[in-house]
Every structure is written in structure tokens, then in C-alpha cells.
Amino acid sequence: MHNPPGGIEWKNPELLAHPTEEDRKKYSYSKLGNIYFTYELDKRLRNINSTIIVNAFNPGMMNTNFSGGHNSKARTAIVKLTMPERLGDLDKSSTALAEVATNEEFNNITGKYFDRSTKYINSSELSYNEENQLELWNKSVEWTDLKKEETMNGIL
């Protein structure tokens, strides 16, 4: 959902940290932020020749209690009609995630976006913006007051 119908436009990390009540796209921004983080971390790990693998995985929209009780039967029916490609299946998505995380065939696949399966795909065009990735990374380091000695050598 990092690329919702109608799209989103990256403004700045401040929007992630302090979303406004009017902004109905904050969930999409949070997903985009996760992908930005994944891609930036992957670049940094490669730069220090690390063997750590990092990927993004979208399980799809699930009928869970995470939405604070907002997933009514009517809402689920509307999503099925209007955005069926956004829905996920708990069993299929969890099995795929477990495969990607543990199966040896994925040992050298890093910096990718998996969408409800074991096949990686391109994420949204916006998610590949390296300036935005770096901006979010730098702000995150600043806001958390992370120090070089608190992390892997060369990652910051």
C-alpha cells in the first residue's frame, strides 16, 4: 500500500514522524518509509561488503484487528470489489515470508521487494528515489541520536 490509488508524493520525513489527522495517506507513507529504509540499508550493507540480507515484504491487506476494528464486512467487500489486487491471504503470505527468510535459494537475494509471494517485483517508482531514501535515513539517525560506535563499522 506504499503506492495507493491516486498515488502519494514524498514531502519529508517530518510527515512520517508527525502525521496530521487530515492526512489519510499516513499508512501509505509509513509503508513507503519502510521501503526507503530497506533500500538504503541494503546499499550501506553492500558498501561494507556485509553478507547480511535485507528485503521488503508486503503481506497484502489482511483482515486483522490491526486496523482498530475498522475492517467491517462492508469495508472488506468494498476492497474486494475496488482493489482486489491489494488483498492478501494470511496462509499464503506467511508461508511466502517464511520461505524468503529461511530458504537457501534466497541467500543471495537482497535489496528486493516481495509482494505476497516468493517472487520479487519492482516497488513503486517513488520508492526508488535515492535522495528521499537518504533523507529519511539521515533524519532517522538524527532523531534517534544514533552514534557510529553503536552500530556496524561503516554503516553510518
Walk through the language-model features, giving the residues of each:
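Rossmann-fold NAD(P)H-dependent dehydrogenase/reductase core
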Residues: M1-H70, D145-L156
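Residue-level signal for pocket-adjacent positions within structured domains
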Residues: N3-P5, A101, S123
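A short C-terminal helix-loop "cap" of Rossmann-like NAD(P)-dependent dehydrogenase/epimerase domains
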Residues: L16-H18, K73-T82
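Short interface patches used for recognition in eukaryotic signaling and trafficking proteins
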Residues: E21-R24, V79-T82, Y120-L126
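C-terminal helical subdomain
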Residues: S30, A56, L81-I121, E130-L134, ...
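Loop/turn elements at helix/coil->beta-strand transitions in domains of secreted/extracellular proteins
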Residues: S50-I52, A77, I109
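C-terminal amphipathic/interface module of NAD(P)-dependent oxidoreductases
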Residues: E125-L156
